[in-house]
């Protein structure tokens, strides 16, 4: 009976979640301008540069009632299309690569958070 109640609640709320996610005031998942810093321990200077990153709202759902169903994956705003650009760190000694590459968001989408390329906010098993 509890499973049926949870399913019924989900079916009732799903259309309102879809409707609410199409509202004109919500911050969409989209590329936005950002200023980042680049550094290398072997180089004396840290520089800042501008790029575009993915940011904004992705519709999500959290179950209020305990359910026997598995947890619902929460989508995040992530890269859909991107290219890489580079900046040169000044003053690096010979033998040290002065180039730092970074992603530039061309388009974004709501999708699963991939631990292989993103910081998803939880514990990591390996460094990026």
UniProtKB/Swiss-Prot annotation:
Alphabetic keyword roster: Disulfide bond, Glycoprotein, Hormone, Secreted, Signal
Record carries keyword ATP-binding: no
GO molecular function, one term: hormone activity
Signal peptide: 1-20
Protein origin, superkingdom: Eukaryota
Record-level GO cellular component terms: cytoplasm; extracellular space
Record's subcellular location: Secreted
Cystines in this chain: 29-77, 43-92, 54-108, 58-110, 113-120
InterPro entries xref list: Cystine-knot_cytokine, Glyco_hormone_CN, Gonadotropin_bsu, Gonadotropin_bsu_CS
Pfam families: Cys_knot
Gene3D superfamilies: Cystine-knot cytokines
CDD domains for this protein: GHB_like
Glycosylation-annotated residues: 33
GO biological process: G protein-coupled receptor signaling pathway
Keyword Lyase belongs to the record: no
Complex formation: Heterodimer of a common alpha chain and a unique beta chain which confers biological specificity to thyrotropin, lutropin, follitropin and gonadotropin.
Known function: Promotes spermatogenesis and ovulation by stimulating the testes and ovaries to synthesize steroids.
The family this protein is said to belong to: Belongs to the glycoprotein hormones subunit beta family.
Protein name from the UniProt record: Lutropin subunit beta
């Amino acid at each position: 009976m509890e499973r049926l109640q949870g399913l019924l609640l989900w079916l009732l709320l799903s259309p309102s979640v879809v409707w609410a996610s199409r509202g004109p005031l919500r911050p969409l998942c989209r590329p936005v301008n950002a200023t980042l810093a680049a550094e290398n321990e072997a180089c004396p200077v840290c520089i800042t540069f501008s790029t575009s990153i993915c940011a904004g709202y992705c519709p999500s759902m959290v179950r209020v009632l305990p359910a026997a169903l598995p947890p619902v994956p929460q989508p995040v705003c992530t890269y859909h299309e991107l290219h890489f650009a580079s900046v040169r760190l000044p003053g690096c000694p010979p033998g040290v690569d002065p180039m730092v590459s970074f992603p530039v968001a061309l388009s974004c989408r709501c999708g699963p958070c991939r631990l292989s390329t993103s910081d998803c906010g939880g514990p990591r098993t390996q460094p990026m």
